[in-house]
C-alpha cells in the first residue's frame, strides 16, 4: 500500500482535534472549521510528512538479513535480522508565516516525528521470512543456492520500536504550551501513529534475495540478503 497522502494525514489530524478546540490564530475560518492560520500549519505539516514518508519508502532498501535453509534442486530457507539502508525520515516542515511562534511549533513537530519514525526504522528486524529458490548442490557435490523472499506485510515480517506518545514528545520540544496547543500536538501525534500503524499493517516488505554456498547432502547453506524493498 502506498504511504499516506497529505490529504489522508490532514483529515486524520482534523478528526483528532477535540470539539472544543479553539484554534490557533484569530483569522476567519475555512471549510473544515479551522482558522486560516491553523489550516495553513496543518497543510504544511501534512504536505511535508507525506512527502518525506514517500521518499523514505520509495528509496530505501532492506539488506543483510541472514538467510539459512537447505534443499537439493528446490531450496527453502528463512531470513532473520537485516537493516534498512537509510533509517532517516527527514520531515522538514517550516513556518508558513513571517515571524511569530509557528516556527517553534513546526521545529518541535519535525524533531518528534523524525525521532519516532527513525527509531522504528533503525530497530526493525525481520523474523522468519521465507526465502524460496533453487540449489545446484547434489548429494555428494557442493553447489550454490539462490533464493528470493516471499513478500509479507511489514508488521508480520518483523518488528521494530513502534511509535507511541508522539504528541507528548512534540509538547516536550516546545518552549511554551497552552491548552489549545496541547490538543493540537496530541492530534498530530495521534494522526501520525494511526497512519503509521495502518501503513505497517497494509504495506509489504520484499526482503530481497540471497545466494550462497550449498553443502552436499541436504544442500544446507546460508547467505546475506540484498535488494529488499517496501511495496
Residue spans of the language-model regions?
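Extracellular "spike/adhesin" assembly and maturation modules
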Residues: 1-231
Amino acid at each position: 500500500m502506498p504511504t499516506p497522502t497529505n490529504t489522508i494525514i490532514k483529515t486524520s489530524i482534523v478528526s483528532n482535534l477535540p470539539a472544543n478546540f479553539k484554534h490557533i490564530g484569530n483569522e476567519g475560518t475555512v471549510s473544515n472549521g479551522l482558522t486560516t492560520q491553523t489550516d495553513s500549519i496543518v497543510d504544511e505539516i501534512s504536505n511535508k510528512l507525506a512527502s518525506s514518508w514517500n521518499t523514505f519508502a520509495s528509496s530505501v532498501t532492506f539488506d543483510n538479513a541472514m538467510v539459512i535453509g537447505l534443499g537439493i534442486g528446490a531450496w527453502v530457507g528463512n531470513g532473520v535480522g537485516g537493516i534498512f539502508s537509510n533509517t532517516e525520515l527527514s520531515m522538514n516542515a517550516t513556518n508558513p508565516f513571517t515571524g511569530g511562534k509557528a516556527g517553534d511549533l513546526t521545529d518541535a513537530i519535525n524533531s518528534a516525528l523524525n525521532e519516532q519514525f527513525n527509531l522504528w526504522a533503525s530497530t526493525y528486524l525481520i523474523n522468519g521470512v521465507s526465502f524460496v529458490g533453487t540449489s545446484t548442490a547434489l548429494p555428494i557435490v557442493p553447489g550454490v543456492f539462490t533464493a528470493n523472499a516471499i513478500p509479507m506485510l511489514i508488521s508480520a515480517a518483523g518488528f521494530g520500536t513502534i511509535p507511541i506518545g508522539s504528541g507528548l514528545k512534540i509538547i516536550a520540544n516546545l518552549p511554551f504550551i497552552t491548552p489549545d496547543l496541547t490538543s493540537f500536538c496530541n492530534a498530530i501525534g495521534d494522526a501520525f501513529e494511526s497512519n503509521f500503524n495502518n501503513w505497517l499493517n497494509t504495506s509489504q516488505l520484499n526482503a530481497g534475495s540471497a545466494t550462497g554456498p550449498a553443502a552436499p547432502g541436504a544442500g544446507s547453506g546460508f547467505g546475506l540478503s540484498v535488494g529488499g524493498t517496501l511495496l
